């Protein structure tokens, strides 16, 4: 995978993540992100992605896009939990790597933005044939990257320290008491699947794909440029 193919891979993920119709990044959300993104890869990029995938994925990137979530419970990968998010001081309208990118033990560089940079560089350096004493696990790098690009576009994975990314904001979702983070992660997609797509994930994916090429086609440039700079304050007691 050359640099141009790598850029195609990243752009495919980013293109999908600007879509307004996808709101939650649970297992189904991550599956949809990767399934749709695959369609925007060049043949060369897709070939190299499949080459890196573990055999059990059977050539399907979407099959491993929740791998990073499942991995966190493993003792050898507890450190990776902090890579799924980054929190800023409450009501700050900016992100500073030196201030915000760390885990609960104040280890620097452990946050989602640093993880995306790190695993992108691992993949890029390998395919640029840059000599390094470190032998990277490129399969893990690909699976981490495909997951973390999804996570960073879930708004509450880039949230405030005070409410732990919305986990402390209690809400009601169709009469079910939960927290705002969980609503964004899974419940919005779950509700949409049942209400509009008869619990058929492939049907929902197809609908989004059709909208990308049809209804939303002329809106892409607007998604890439956010001109409104507003500070939004969460309401600790909300009814949805």
Region locations from a protein language model:
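N-terminal, motif-rich segments that launch catalysis or mediate targeting to/interaction with membranes
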Residues: 2-8, 17-148, 155-240
């Amino acid at each position: 995978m050359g640099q141009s193919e790598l850029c195609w891979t990243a752009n495919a993920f980013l293109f999908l993540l600007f879509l307004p119709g996808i709101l939650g990044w649970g297992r189904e959300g991550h599956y949809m992100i990767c399934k749709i993104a695959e369609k925007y890869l060049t043949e060369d990029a897709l070939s190299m992605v499949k080459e890196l995938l573990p055999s059990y994925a059977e050539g399907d990137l979407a099959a491993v896009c929740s791998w990073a979530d499942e991995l966190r419970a493993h003792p050898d990968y507890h450190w990776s939990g902090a890579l799924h998010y980054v929190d800023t001081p409450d009501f700050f309208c900016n992100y500073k790597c030196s201030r915000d990118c760390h885990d609960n033990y104040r280890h620097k560089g452990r946050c989602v933005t640093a993880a995306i940079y790190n695993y992108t560089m691992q993949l890029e350096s390998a395919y640029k044939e840059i000599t390094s004493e470190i032998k990277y696990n490129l399969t893990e790098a690909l699976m981490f990257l495909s997951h973390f690009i999804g996570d960073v576009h879930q708004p509450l994975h880039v949230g405030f320290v005070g409410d732990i990314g919305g986990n402390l904001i209690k809400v009601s979702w169709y009469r079910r008491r939960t927290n705002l983070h969980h609503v964004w992660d899974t419940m919005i997609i779950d509700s949409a699947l049942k209400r509009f797509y008869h619990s058929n994930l492939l049907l929902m994916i197809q609908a989004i794909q059709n909208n990308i090429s049809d209804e939303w086609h002329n809106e892409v440039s607007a998604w890439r440029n956010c001109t409104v700079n507003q500070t939004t304050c969460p309401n600790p007691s909300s009814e949805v």
